[in-house]
UniProtKB/Swiss-Prot annotation:
<dbReference type="GO" id="GO:0016836">
    <property type="term" value="F:hydro-lyase activity"/>
</dbReference>
<keyword id="KW-0456">Lyase</keyword>
<protein>
    <recommendedName>
        <fullName>Chorismate dehydratase</fullName>
        <ecNumber>4.2.1.151</ecNumber>
    </recommendedName>
</protein>
<dbReference type="InterPro" id="IPR030868">
    <property type="entry name" value="MqnA"/>
</dbReference>
<comment type="function">
    <text>Catalyzes the dehydration of chorismate into 3-[(1-carboxyvinyl)oxy]benzoate, a step in the biosynthesis of menaquinone (MK, vitamin K2).</text>
</comment>
<comment type="pathway">
    <text>Quinol/quinone metabolism; menaquinone biosynthesis.</text>
</comment>
<dbReference type="Pfam" id="PF02621">
    <property type="entry name" value="VitK2_biosynth"/>
</dbReference>
<dbReference type="InterPro" id="IPR003773">
    <property type="entry name" value="Menaquinone_biosynth"/>
</dbReference>
<keyword id="KW-0474">Menaquinone biosynthesis</keyword>
<dbReference type="GO" id="GO:0009234">
    <property type="term" value="P:menaquinone biosynthetic process"/>
</dbReference>
<comment type="similarity">
    <text>Belongs to the MqnA/MqnD family. MqnA subfamily.</text>
</comment>
């Protein structure tokens, strides 16, 4: 038997928001048991859907579009219950004045983009003219009235560039929470259904390893922040606040939020409004 193929092919998002899910794996040596692929959320989602990965993070929209082929891991996700800090709309004008205005999308991450579009159209009653471009805030603001940013670029805009340039920074997680009263889920961890059926024991072990890593990282969040601050443009306190602002749970409230998001955007985004989310069984 090809021994290397018994190691699960696991995805890893190269954003700060996923560091607490992987930091503990490195500490325990569990990473040695994985064939790890690092990339952006969009690329990892594509690889999981295509079958190039067995297990990994998948953006919520891509998960819902491919729910028949994927099984979600319970109690692990990247989300928020209120502000998220790293998914933002940066604007030069109030959001309700963006009708017909140019809005730059600094990411192809369908979930954050669909959330921003949903909020602007249904909560603020505007239909901007959207276009996609690299996530460089100063360039975006030369051509657009507002910009949608995610991940580390959004964190920089939120903490550094927005205040420096005198721009309004609107947190997508906070806007959603104010509007619906619900948390939000940006990405879930999932296994391909065919892999989970073929390798149920390994799949459950990977799930358990991620939960243990998440728990260890949050218990030692100051250490995680201290290490991350060595190579990031943020100080330890900012990173510790960020890691504890993020919500890495995926339970009943988060499932309710997924149901509500699907109801609102499913038919225009490529999945049924009542799409079913299947969770990995213990």
């Amino acid at each position: 038997m090809d021994n290397s193929r018994t190691r699960p092919r696991v995805g890893h998002i190269q954003f700060l928001n996923c560091l607490p899910l992987y930091w503990g794996l490195a500490r325990t040596g569990t990473l040695l048991d994985f064939e790890l692929t690092k990339d952006t959320p969009e690329k990892l989602s594509e690889q999981l859907v295509r079958g190039d990965l067995d297990i990994g993070p998948v953006t919520l929209v891509e998960f819902l579009k491919n729910a028949d082929d994927l099984v979600a891991f319970p109690d692990i996700a990247v989300g928020c219950d209120g502000p998220v800090m790293s998914c933002v709309i940066v604007s030069q004008v109030p959001l309700d004045r963006l009708d017909g205005a140019r809005v730059a999308l600094g990411s192809t991450s369908r979930t954050s983009v669909r959330l921003a579009q949903l909020l602007l159209s249904e909560r603020f009653g505007v239909q901007p003219d959207y276009y996609t471009c690299p996530p460089d805030l100063s360039l975006m603001m030369q051509e657009a009235d507002a910009a949608v940013l995610i991940g580390d670029a959004a964190l920089r805009a939120n903490m550094i560039d927005g205040p420096r340039y005198g721009l309004d920074v609107h947190d997508l997680g906070a806007l959603w929470k104010e509007w619906t009263g619900l948390p939000f889920v940006f990405a879930v961890w999932a296994a391909r259904r065919d892999y989970a059926e073929r390798e149920p024991v390994i799949t459950r072990k990977v799930h358990e390893a991620f939960l243990a890593s998440r728990n260890l990282s949050l218990e030692e969040v100051e250490k995680v922040a201290e290490q991350a601050a060595r190579w990031e443009a943020f100080d330890e306190d900012t990173l510790a606040k960020y890691f504890t602002t993020l919500d890495f749970r995926f339970g009943a409230p988060q499932l309710e939020a997924v149901t509500e998001f699907a109801r609102r955007v499913g038919p225009t985004t490529g999945f049924p409004a009542d799409v079913k989310v299947e969770l990995l069984k213990p």
